[in-house]
Amino acid sequence: MNAARVLSRLTRKPLDTPIAAVMRPCEIRAFVELVKLKQGSTDNVVLIGIDCYGAYSNTDYSRITASSKGAESTLAFYRSVLSGNGTAAEGTDISVACKSCEHPAAPNADITIGLFGTNMEESLLFLPNTEKGGQILHVLGLSEKADEPAGRQRVIAELVSERVAYRDRMFESTAAVVSDVDKLMSYLGNCVNCYNCRVACPVCYCRECVFTTDVFDHEPFQYFRWAKRKGMIKMPTDTVFYHLTRMAHMSTACIGCGQCSNACPNGVPVMELFRTVAHAVQSAFNYSAGASFEEDPPLSVFQEREFSEVTGGKD
């Protein structure tokens, strides 16, 4: 589960007890979107981000750690990465979502635990990104560890460049296999309407989803009518419509964490489809989901002049 969902539950109402939340960059970005959607608050919360080299899928991680303790596997992973041996372990690499993530650091956290460009065996880097974060590091006596080492930004830039190249190849290949309705239906063919992707999505926050209401609780005769009209009918129905609806609702807020694919029992590559669409939508609005608490979500504001290619440039 993306930790933003958990933090949202804890902060929807005022807190008397302060919370320190240690989160990956994608989780912080998801929480940023939830705060802007009034589904959480940063009051009495300290966001601690950690540089992220990526994560395995749930099933891969369970298999890799089955023969060892989780902490040992985590340390082995970081030693492998920091020694230049990559992220693969036992023939398994990090998830596609992580390979295509261009936000491996968390500048929107109060405090960043820096791993890029550091020797983790010798020390940890603590970077204050906000006044709140700086005050906490000062109280803890960690202010002297807040100097960014030379080469850190170069390491981050190289990793981002590698991931952006992978991401763009993913966009291209995904767009090719969903370029028409028939291809999209085939792409989503294994979907069984379990709605796990909706439940796992950190920014899908509706208390009641239209797809679990009577709107899609069709009468038996309707199925036979549709089958007679078309000559056949695929069961379960509305699978493509469900994903199209989710994309319409969530594409401006998708942060590409990959939990949708993680939760799918049938291996539908949901993340690849949603990220491809979300990237196009967010680019159209010049918006990056989760990048800033101050930037309003695109559909929450009105611009007098935008999309001139649609309006013909008319005022």
Language model features by range: what are they?
Residues 1-184:
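Iron-sulfur-associated redox domains of electron-transfer enzymes in respiratory
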Residues 24-29, 93-105, 189-210, 251-267:
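Local cysteine-cluster metal-coordination motifs and their immediate loop/turn environment
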Residues 47, 59, 193-196, 203, ...:
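Generic hydrophobic/packing signal
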Residues 122-131, 137-140, 194-215:
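Internal hydrophobic scaffold segments of catalytic domains
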Residues 163-189, 206-315:
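Ferredoxin-type iron-sulfur electron-transfer modules in oxidoreductases and energy-metabolism complexes
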